[in-house]
Each structure stands twice: as structure tokens, then as C-alpha cells.
Curated annotation (Swiss-Prot):
Its EC number is 4.1.1.130. Its main location: mitochondrion. InterPro entries: Coq4 (IPR007715), Coq4_euk (IPR027540). Lyase that catalyzes the C1-decarboxylation of 4-hydroxy-3-methoxy-5-(all-trans-decaprenyl)benzoic acid into 2-methoxy-6-(all-trans-decaprenyl)phenol during ubiquinone biosynthesis. GO terms for biological process: ubiquinone biosynthetic process. The keyword Magnesium does not apply. Disulfide bonds: none annotated. This is Ubiquinone biosynthesis protein coq4, mitochondrial.
Length: 239
């Protein structure tokens, strides 16, 4: 059966899909995401549709094998402007993770409230894993000090793919560079792909980091603890 209402709804907002519907949704969202990489809604749909049944389950199992990962899955925290208490983060010392994070989102004009909810993942726990991955994304940027321009987003997608193995990261990492000009593509291959691969392989599984518990810690100590290096400088306006 190919109709969504023929399948059970497993959590609020869940949209169940048949295998055929999932296949078309992956193809359509991948095409739209590559044509318009700023369409966060399409990237979110692609992540939902392509992550199951294998990739999200494997990522969840890795979280279950880790003490902090198990705690995150049990408590299922959400990252919002309210839960992170952004006004408080702006009062923290300059080199704390929380201050680095809030300064980064202010500079890049983004908000933790903009992440689309998971809809197309059937298992509720796996749906939370996808949501957690999505909501942690800005912390990867902030700790790495990568802007939200095309090169910065692609570098983080490479990092996410190598570290967590989700297909949405692989598709963005492999095909996204086609949108770079010759100078950008050369710089990206020489500098940011090696950085992403090196750090993706050696870093802690990034969804196993309880970012909310690290906000008042020195960001350099956090980087050392999770084994994630700051990226080579890339200006938001780099041509």
C-alpha cells in the first residue's frame, strides 16, 4: 500500500511513507537540495527520508553504546532559544563554549529555533536521533568557527558524513562542491576536505556530546575533550 494513512502514525507530526513514496521523496529532495542548498526544509526532508532504515539505526546503536549517548537518548533534550537561554549565554566569558556559540549565531543571523521537526522517520527514537543531529549542527559550526556560506556548509557536511555516516551528509559533500567556482573548489579540496576527514575520523561521535552541559566550559578545553580542531580561517565573504 502506498498511502500514508494506511500506515500507523508513531508520534506527533509523523508522516508515514511507503517504500515507493520514500524513494520519490529522497530523489525529489536531493534534486531540490542541490539546486538550492539554502533550502533547509529540503535538506531536512532529505535527511529524514534517506536516514532509515539502516543509517539512523546504526547511529542510535552507537549512542546506546556510549554513556553520554544513552543519557541523551533517555532525557531527549531539545535545543531552542529558550532551553539554551541565549541572554544568559551572552553574559558568559568570551572563551566559553556558550559565548562562542551565541556570538556565532548572532554573527551568522541564525537561530536554534529554525530547525525543522523530524517527520518522515518511522521509529520515534530514531526520529529523535535525527532531530538531535539537526539541532547540534550549529555547534559544529561554532566550535569549528565555520561560516554559513557554501564552503563553510560543505566543510561541515563533510565532517558530519565522515563522523556520523548519514546519507544526507554524503550527498551534500559529494555533489555540493559542484556549486563552487574554480578558486573555491581548489581551496576546498586542498584545505577543508582534509580538515573534515581528519577531524571526522578522530573526533568523538558528535551526537554523543551533551553540548548543553559544556556551555560554561572553556571552548579550547571542549575542543580538546571531543578531539575537534578549529578549522582554518574562512571569511564569510571569501570569494
Amino acid at each position: 500500500m502506498f498511502f500514508p494513512n494506511a500506515r500507523p502514525v508513531n508520534y506527533p507530526g509523523h508522516i508515514p511513507l511507503s517504500p515507493l513514496q520514500r524513494m520519490f521523496l529522497v530523489a525529489g529532495s536531493a534534486i531540490m537540495g542541490l539546486k538550492a542548498p539554502w533550502r533547509g526544509d529540503m535538506i531536512a526532508v532529505l535527511g529524514d527520508a534517506s536516514g532509515q532504515p539502516f543509517f539512523l539505526r546504526r547511529l542510535r546503536d552507537k549512542m546506546l553504546a556510549n554513556e553520554t549517548g544513552r543519557r541523551i537518548l533517555k532525557e531527549q533534550p531539545r535545543m531552542t532559544s529558550k532551553s539554551l537561554n541565549l541572554p544568559h549565554l551572552r553574559t558568559l566569558p568570551p572563551n566559553t563554549l556558550g559565548r562562542i556559540y551565541v556570538d556565532w549565531i548572532d554573527k551568522e543571523h541564525v537561530t536554534p529555533d529554525s530547525r525543522a521537526p523530524t517527520r518522515y522517520v518511522d521509529d520515534p527514537e530514531e526520529a529523535y536521533v535525527m532531530q538531535r543531529y539537526r539541532e547540534c549542527h550549529d555547534f559544529f559550526h561554532a566550535v569549528s568557527q565555520m561560516p554559513t556560506n557554501i564552503e563553510g556548509e560543505l566543510a561541515i557536511k563533510w565532517l558530519e558524513f565522515i563522523n556520523m555516516g548519514l546519507p544526507v551528509g554524503a550527498l551534500s559533500a559529494l555533489f555540493g562542491p559542484l556549486r563552487l567556482n574554480r578558486v573555491q573548489a581548489s581551496r576546498f579540496r586542498r584545505t577543508y576536505v582534509p580538515w573534515a576527514i581528519r577531524n571526522g575520523l578522530k573526533a568523538e561521535l558528535l551526537v554523543n556530546v551533551y553540548w548543553e552541559k559544556e556551555l560554561e566550559n572553556d571552548v579550547d578545553e571542549v575542543r580538546q575533550h571531543i578531539r575537534l580542531q578549529q578549522a582554518p580561517a574562512l571569511s564569510p565573504n571569501t570569494p
